[in-house]
Regions:
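Acidic, glycine-rich active-site loops and adjacent beta-strand->loop/helix elements
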Residues: 107-110, 148-152, 180
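N-terminal amphipathic, basic helical "cap/leader" segment at the start of enzyme domains
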Residues: 21-101, 107
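A short coil-to-beta-strand element that immediately follows conserved catalytic motifs
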Residues: 70, 141-145, 169
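Sec-dependent N-terminal signal peptides
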Residues: 4-14
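Sec/Tat signal peptide C-region and signal peptidase I cleavage site
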Residues: 16-20
Length: 189
């Protein structure tokens, strides 16, 4: 009986310790979620492109997907001339002109679910995009989701611009860099 009581006490203390840790992590995560904002102007400050893009892509690919299909492709662009041309071509992505990095999140239709559930690729790639945006913010970087799909005109234009095969469908362009200013999140509640 004494061993059982000691076990319950230890279990309770251990559980309380975990609850405290989980609560702390939860509060930190909620802070990142609530303070993230769309950043459209970037400072002329360098970033460690390889390290940053690796971390952002790791976060993106940790997203859940329907049937674990992972129907995504990520195109990383670091060439400022290409980003500037894209920013002029895609007015909703003018933030590319000052970004140090851009990631284009695409759906790979060869990896997507077949049949009536095919469009789940949009949700899968959207979840990956949100993970990427939150990770960028947690690293002190700014980013903005510039929509491409479902606009047929934008989708076809970007496919042509990047010479993408027909099965790769761009969902969005995400310009990334050090924010030029402190951007406050919009009131949403």
């Amino acid at each position: 009986m004494k061993k059982y009581i000691v076990f319950l006490i230890l279990t309770g203390l251990f559980g309380f310790g975990l609850m405290g840790q989980n609560e702390k992590v939860g509060k930190e995560l909620m802070k990142v979620i609530k303070t993230r904002a769309s950043v459209r102007q970037f400072a002329d400050k360098p970033i460690e492109v390889e390290k940053v893009s690796h971390m952002l892509l790791d976060a993106a690919m940790a997203a859940p997907t329907a049937m674990n299909k992972q129907p995504w492709e990520f195109i990383v662009i670091t060439d400022s001339e290409i980003m500037e041309k894209m920013g002029k071509e895609f007015k909703n992505a003018s933030a590319l002109s000052t970004a140090k990095l851009a990631i284009i999140v695409c759906g790979n239709m060869k990896e997507a679910i077949e049949g009536e559930s095919r469009e789940f690729w949009v949700q899968d790639c959207s979840a990956a995009t949100e993970n990427l945006l939150l990770m960028a913010h947690s690293m002190g970087l700014g980013a903005v989701w510039c929509g491409i799909y479902p606009s047929k005109e934008r989708t076809e234009l970007l496919q042509k611009f990047l010479n993408l095969p027909e099965n790769i469908v761009p969902l969005n362009i995400i310009p990334i860099g050090v924010p030029a200013d402190n951007v406050a999140p919009k009131e949403k509640f």
